[in-house]
């Protein structure tokens, strides 16, 4: 499904068109009979003029959905077309010209019609899910759509702005599970990135928000994934696996579920399954960014060449990947490369923290040990040994 084009004449409304697209992708993904490409890959075509035949070939899909969104005060117009990729033929097209309050119904109708056209019928789960209205407040819905796009940037300032929007959404509708889930994600990102002076407080707030989201809606895959990663970092391995299993049963096309299951498998020492799960995430999201998780899986399996290749891909995206790259080089005997990667990591991480007025940790080894919950001590020692050999203490 391609990103719907924002036809509102206001670039600031891009987040709304993107959010509508993402919600429909999520709805379609929950049907096992459909193979649905994830948001990360489909959004790489945003703003580009590309033939559907080329998109179908690059992503390995038979059908493409495209459309547009025009938001006008209290009204909204959405167009959608289902196209056969190989031929370019339109299988279905519709225009929805409604009151803005009908946005959830429109998303449901697009999802149901696409599934009915391709599969011939709707499953019970799809019907139940499609009829669920996430919130009674359109303003809260708008806040969540905006916050979601800010969180995707994974920058400290955007995370703080997203938190404010999500708090506003929750104030308008305290039972809006999705808002609580994304608030948990925002605090999690703050903790994981080291963007807070009091790390434990951010982690605890993330846990509280996720727990609230699960109580409000335990059938949301994103909520389950969020709870799973929090349980994993608390070393609650059985609980983490239960949440990841549930997430994938609710949405088998969710690449984040496969990615986090890969990370869970890495942490418990099941490297074979970790690699298999990250490959599944890449299958559903071929243009996504999974080098970091793939690198950790290969490092833990002592496959250093594969790990180095993976971490080199994310070198410019995730500065902590440089520390892992340094450990990989150190364990494979490339001490010069290890020291260079370690030095680059320290320089970039220290600058980033200084820009945020956050002091660097007294021990980088302790920093990584806290954030990577290995179940077996030999795997943890293996990571810390690699960091030490690279010069990170």
Predicted regions and their residues:
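Acidic, proline/glycine-rich low-complexity intrinsically disordered segments
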Residues: 2-310, 321, 328-332
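Alpha-helix boundary recognition
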Residues: 29, 56-57, 312-315, 346, ...
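Acidic, Ser/Thr-rich low-complexity linear motifs
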Residues: 130-133, 196-197, 351-371
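TPR/TPR-like (Sel1-like) alpha-helical repeat modules
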Residues: 206, 315-319, 330-353
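Short beta-alpha connecting loops at secondary-structure transitions
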Residues: 292, 321-323, 365-369
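Terminal, low-structured helical/coil segments at or just beyond the last alpha-helical repeat
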Residues: 359-393
């Amino acid at each position: 499904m391609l990103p719907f084009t924002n036809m509102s004449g206001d670039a600031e409304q891009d987040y709304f068109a993107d959010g509508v697209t993402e919600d429909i992708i999520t709805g379609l993904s929950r049907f096992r009979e459909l193979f649905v490409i994830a948001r990360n890959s489909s959004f790489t075509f945003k703003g580009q003029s590309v033939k559907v035949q080329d998109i179908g070939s690059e992503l390995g899909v038979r059908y493409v959905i495209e459309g547009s969104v025009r938001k006008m005060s209290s009204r909204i117009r959405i167009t959608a077309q289902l196209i056969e990729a190989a031929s370019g033929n339109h299988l279905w097209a519709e225009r929805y010209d409604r009151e803005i309050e009908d946005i959830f119904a429109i998303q449901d109708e697009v999802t149901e019609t696409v599934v009915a056209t391709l599969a011939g019928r709707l499953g019970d789960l799809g019907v139940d899910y499609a009829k669920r209205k996430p919130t009674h407040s359109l303003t809260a819905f708008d806040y969540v759509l905006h916050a979601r796009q800010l969180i995707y940037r994974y920058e400290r300032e955007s995370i703080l702005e997203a938190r404010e929007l999500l708090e506003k959404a929750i104030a308008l509708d305290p039972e809006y599970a999705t808002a609580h889930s994304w608030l948990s994600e925002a605090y999690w990102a703050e903790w994981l990135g080291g963007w807070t002076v009091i790390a434990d407080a951010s982690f605890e707030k993330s846990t509280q928000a996720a727990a609230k989201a699960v109580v409000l809606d335990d059938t949301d895959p994103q909520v389950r994934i969020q709870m799973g990663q929090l349980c994993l970092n608390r070393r609650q391995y059985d609980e983490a696996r239960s949440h990841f299993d549930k997430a994938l049963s609710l949405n088998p096309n969710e690449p984040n579920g496969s990615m986090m299951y890969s990370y869970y498998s890495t942490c418990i020492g099941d490297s074979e399954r970790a690699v298999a799960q990250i490959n599944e995430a890449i299958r559903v999201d071929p243009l996504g960014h999974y080098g970091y998780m793939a690198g950790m899986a290969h490092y833990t399996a002592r496959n250093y060449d594969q790990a180095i290749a993976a971490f080199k891909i994310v070198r410019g995206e995730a500065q902590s990947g440089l520390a892992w790259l340094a450990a990989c080089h150190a364990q494979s005997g490339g001490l010069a490369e290890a020291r260079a990667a370690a030095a680059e990591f320290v320089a970039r991480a220290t600058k980033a923290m200084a820009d945020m007025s956050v002091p660097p940790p007294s021990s980088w080894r302790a920093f990584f040990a806290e954030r990577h919950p290995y179940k077996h001590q030999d795997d943890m020692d293996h990571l810390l040994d690699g960091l030490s050999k690279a010069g990170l203490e």
